[in-house]
């Protein structure tokens, strides 16, 4: 029994040491991966609590296990806060991830072999929106739409034509590398015209939707899924929302027992904490600054001669088109990684390179904005990235860029 009272550094010094090393990496690197953010200590405290010990299959007050009286209250708070935050009538907070949330929707609304329609992965879509390597592309007949070749933005008339030609059962809007606002009302009109369900996957923009900076999909879509991290700043997890409570109930059974067993109640508690944080006024200020930072970053990259997909951004994503400097995403990712800037290579629309090489580099402002970075700081970030990419063989400049990164990290510390 004594093992349960041992501190991690005593029970498993190897893991404790690696966690400490990762903590140092996060503190001393510039985190620009668009799907990552930093949670509060309160969120981490909830997730690392005794709630991890409890099994709670079912829904609040409808459990298959006893001893859930406190769990029910915690999950109930998470549900009510999610509904309040997004102005939804129904919510399920149990999905372990955004992918699980999407799969639960498919399980509820579709039969194998039916048609789904989502954005092409290389244009900014997501694996779970019909990619052939994902179950969504294996079980369903996937049709894809993309952006205009010139503007690199969605042209809704083109989306409409593809929908009319293919008559999908489900249309998906919401993306992983699309830096512009989404016209949910236009998607609703198209879905109605072809008799399709409409799913919005707002995983990347949930924080912006919650604060009204991005238009909400809730009034226009049959169902909405999201992750709870990214711009929402919560723990890694998923969430399903509906404007209609009766319609939403069908997804409860799709989550459990349809696609999951016991919910992760320690993560659900952390979600509740994050939703509570997002309901406070300071979160709106954070999201407003996040977008300002993105626009500043995009403009400075363009000023330095590096093209930006769609010629700018409306959200936290800045997607660089490195064909403008004759460089691949793989090369660029390696170059900035060497100065402790964390990004990811990414395809750009109509990319001639493979997904393992790519012509793009995806940047995101969510994590550094959490650290307190403002527009002047992001101009510094843009300049050191541009300096590195435009002078890849200059080792003296590389060392200077490394020091500039460390100076920025010291000016904007992560955790006390």
Swiss-Prot record:
Show the GO cellular component annotation of the record: cytosol
Listed under catalytic activity are:
(6R)-5,10-methylene-5,6,7,8-tetrahydrofolate + glycine + H2O = (6S)-5,6,7,8-tetrahydrofolate + L-serine
Q: Name one GO molecular function term.
A: glycine hydroxymethyltransferase activity
UniProt cofactor(s)? pyridoxal 5'-phosphate
- Keyword terms: Amino-acid biosynthesis, Cytoplasm, One-carbon metabolism, Pyridoxal phosphate, Transferase
Q: Where in the cell is it found?
A: Cytoplasm
Q: Where does (6S)-5,6,7,8-tetrahydrofolate bind?
A: 121, 125-127, 354-356
Q: Which family does it belong to?
A: Belongs to the SHMT family.
Assembly: Homodimer.
Please give the name of this protein. Answer: Serine hydroxymethyltransferase
Q: Which organism is it from?
A: Prochlorococcus marinus (strain MIT 9211)
User: Which gene is transcribed and translated to give this protein?
Assistant: glyA
